[in-house]
Curated annotation (Swiss-Prot):
HAMAP family registered for this protein in UniProt: CH60 (MF_00600)
Keywords recorded for this protein, A-Z: ATP-binding, Chaperone, Cytoplasm, Isomerase, Nucleotide-binding
GO molecular function annotations of the record: ATP binding; ATP-dependent protein folding chaperone; isomerase activity; unfolded protein binding
Subcellular location: Cytoplasm
Protein name per its UniProtKB record: Chaperonin GroEL 3
Protein's UniProt keywords contain Isomerase: yes
Keyword Nucleotide-binding tagged: yes
Cellular component, GO, one term: cytoplasm
Enzyme class at the top of the EC tree: isomerase
Function: Together with its co-chaperonin GroES, plays an essential role in assisting protein folding. The GroEL-GroES system forms a nano-cage that allows encapsulation of the non-native substrate proteins and provides a physical environment optimized to promote and accelerate protein folding.
Binding site for ATP: 29-32, 86-90, 414, 477-479, 493
UniProt-listed InterPro entries: Cpn60/GroEL, Cpn60/GroEL/TCP-1, GroEL-like_apical_dom_sf, GROEL-like_equatorial_sf, TCP-1-like_intermed_sf
EC identifiers of the protein: 5.6.1.7
Amino acid sequence: MAKDLRFNVEARRLLEAGVNALADAVKVTLGPKGRNAVIEKLTGPPTITNDGVTIAREIQLRNPFANMGAQLVKEVATKTNGTAGDGTTTATVLAQALVREGLHAVDGGANPMFLKNGIEAAVAALLEEFEKYRGEVEGEADLARVATLAANNDARIGDVVAAALGRVGCDGVVTVEESPIFGLEVSFVDGIELDNGYLSPYMVTDTERMEAAYTDPYILLTNEKISQVQTLMPVLELVTRAGGQLIVFAENVEGPALGMLVANNVHGTFRSAVVRAPGFGHRRLAELNDLAVFLGGQVITADAGLSLDRVTLGQLGRCKKATITEHATTIVDGAGSATEIHARIDQLKRELERAENPHDQDTLQTRIARLSGGVAVIRVGAVTGVELKEKLHRVEDSLAAARAALAEGVVAGGGTALLQAASALDKLTLTGDAAEGREIVRRAIAEPLRWIAINAGYDGDEVVKRVAELPRGHGFNAATGEYGEMAGFGVIDPVKVTRCALQSAASIAALLLTTETLVVEEVIGNPGAVIAPGFGDLAEGLVRPSNIA
């Protein structure tokens, strides 16, 4: 395939044009008085948002060379969002400033590799400075401040997120769901909740509520399919002699085996319920083992040399209470050892640290939360679908920021911590172009505060100059126009968000500065193409070979 190439200064300028196009669209949303962006959708109403990564994901430039620059900055926002869940606009603004200042230095004759070394050394020094001055989140009030700030100063969202995390803790699961009812509410689930319910409505014990409630039941855990009555009979006889009730978690129970259990329930001879085991494939056995630890039982599986016809009461799990509905199962106060449960949680945390796939990370986080006994559900309702999407984005950003604050602590917000950390760069001894790399970082870290001030209607340069002279932790509150202690204003940022924004921006910017050649597929003119606005290159009759079937 033929390729189109650009070199040296021209290549870097095209990349910078793409960086600026994306960053200019995103940075107007920064700060408490940032504006929204309206994004067209080919189907349905447009999306209104001030979430940086949501805007960045929608941007695709026509010029393929400039588009590469835009995609690199999009990677900055995406990486920051994936790691910290917030701070995407700050990361984008930092990346733009680093690229602008860095390319100016390269045009002046600086060696890009030495600039890169200086930038990396400066970022490392700033991260050490954040560690020195970070504070811990002290109580729900601090958490609410962080959450409110991330939700664009919506105190109601901040309070709800703080209440949710305050109850379930950093390891707990907080899910965000759409609600048909206008407003915002949070509910909590005690114990372990699974998404699977009973296999048959004949298993309910309360016909009004259509739920099966069991006290001190025996619980059989297996990853096998059960269809024959003979397979279950040994377990039923054991539980019957013990005078108990039985809950079966299995891959499936069907045919005569299910019919027998249903008949026993209908006639009142033996109470039991069947729930499909959680998870799929290899994850099913892992999640069953989680349940076994929580319930103090064993998973009956042929892989472990165990069979259903030789089950003992000691291999069955126990709990104080289990409630099963058509779609969910809640288990409270399992009989498992606290020591073993904590050991299992630690094992899952180690797996989470190694996991790279986002789906695996979410699954592990959910499993940790189940064993920790903490699940909260935030339900979000709005008048219109457009408002609902915008509100959901703010709740998710708020939740991510609050989690980050619990994980690594907080620093002064509103761009103050970044600007005032510049004092750490004074102690960094570098020479030549590496020293210029340090100064590039010094100038770039003032940009978030400058744009927060500009978006609020103030002189950005004047605000930066004044905050640089204030005592550490004192800054500019763009919401009110006041100068003072940022913690007192309730303007605090998670260290994790600030750190990830700086690291992601510096990583991409340093690589971009060392670029000398751009290579794209050559665009082929197709004058016979039908123009259909809104469909990119294909709409204009410009087709790349990779788009041709």
